[in-house]
């Protein structure tokens, strides 16, 4: 363009950006290493504030040691870009840049990606457990203060507080034991790493042993992982960050510098996030999970329903018996409009239709008839029960109901007539002599008329 043409194969001169990019990567790496160094110093200060022998102080020291190992790897490789960083590492007890170690001193083992991930996960678990332990201790103190100072508590409220106090005491003991086991397992992991490093220097061990020790250390703290199962779930939803921080030595080329910068940025972000989450309070899961009602679900019990009518397929509609659905008998309609009455409104309307289909019944009369039916059945039942009790019987018989209906209401049950009523209603037939006399009287009357 602009009058300048380039033939095919002619090299085009472009400005070189190599030194500028190298300087930018170097500055970025310096900032990231400085951030890691400040994070390590902050963890050391926090450990001194809470106490080096306390469980929380041990957690802070372990986190500071993890960051220090990363910086030591860069110092031993001679890739620290700033002399000031080297002096700060030396003041914190780190190795000097480019200084060879004596042969009689034991080198500190370098952590691979798997071991570093494991340590970070353990640190998070210990930190979360320590936060929940602090919250539970505060809640226990409030409950004890309420029980000792508030004299207006009723019996149910006091029993509920005492129950919560006992539950918190048990959980505090469990969390304390889990934290102690977690710290002990991390220390054992570090000791095994040191011994495996010595074995590798003397040629008596292989990387397989290191991985075996890692698996053993992973299985040494099941109690801590079970205790923190509910604690890690909300933390992972709030802070979805990767726990794996691979350690890659700093190279000379621009690609290696870019990879190193990305990994250091991830590590610095993770360590800063852990430091910021130290004093954040979260709602413990035991405050809601343990008070939820337990639902016992029962498996359904299979049952067979006989077919409603005889069919050629044995109760199945059509087709194959194994592929079709059996015909089920329909349940009778359940009426809800009776209002706990013995006689339903539907039956009353049916009776009215049988007597006269054109007549209507008013709601007040309908309620009155339903009440009369209920009172009638109740009175008959009570009187029949008294008769059965008078007979010294525990079972109500038909004759008890029958006697009350016949004597008091003049109602005879069809098919259930008593013996005395049958005798009174029985008619005697005339004798032959009486029939002859009646015939003679009839004949005489007819003759007199003629």
Swiss-Prot record:
Region called Disordered, residue ranges: 1-29, 190-281, 426-450
Presence of keyword Transcription: yes
Comp. bias regions, Polar residues: 1-10, 19-29, 190-212, 237-246, 255-281, 430-441
Domain Histone-fold: 338-413
GO cellular component entries: nucleus; SAGA complex; transcription factor TFIID complex
UniProt xrefs under InterPro entries: Histone-fold, TAF12, TFIID_TAF12_dom
Short name of one Pfam family: TFIID_20kDa
Main location per the UniProt record: nucleus
Membrane-spanning ranges: none
Residue positions where Phosphoserine is found in the record: 297
Biased composition, class Low complexity, residue ranges: 217-236
Keywords assigned by UniProt, alphabetized: Nucleus, Phosphoprotein, Transcription, Transcription regulation
S-adenosyl-L-methionine in keyword set: no
Compartment annotation: Nucleus
A GO BP entry: transcription initiation at RNA polymerase II promoter
GO molecular function terms listed in the Swiss-Prot or TrEMBL record: DNA binding; protein heterodimerization activity; RNA polymerase II general transcription initiation factor activity; TBP-class protein binding
Record-linked PANTHER family: TRANSCRIPTION INITIATION FACTOR TFIID SUBUNIT 12 (PTHR12264:SF21)
UniProt similarity note: Belongs to the TAF12 family.
Function, in words: Functions as a component of both the DNA-binding general transcription initiation factor complex TFIID and the transcription coactivator SAGA complex. Binding of TFIID to a promoter (with or without TATA element) is the initial step in pre-initiation complex (PIC) formation.
Subunit structure: Component of the 1.8 MDa SAGA (Spt-Ada-Gcn5 acetyltransferase) complex, which is composed of 19 subunits tra1, spt7, taf5, ngg1/ada3, sgf73, spt20, spt8, taf12, taf6, hfi1/ada1, ubp8, gcn5, ada2, spt3, sgf29, taf10, taf9, sgf11 and sus1.
Name of this chain's protein: SAGA complex/transcription factor TFIID complex subunit Taf12
Species of provenance: Schizosaccharomyces pombe (strain 972 / ATCC 24843) (Fission yeast)
Taxonomic lineage: Eukaryota, Fungi, Dikarya, Ascomycota, Taphrinomycotina
Gene this chain is encoded by: taf12
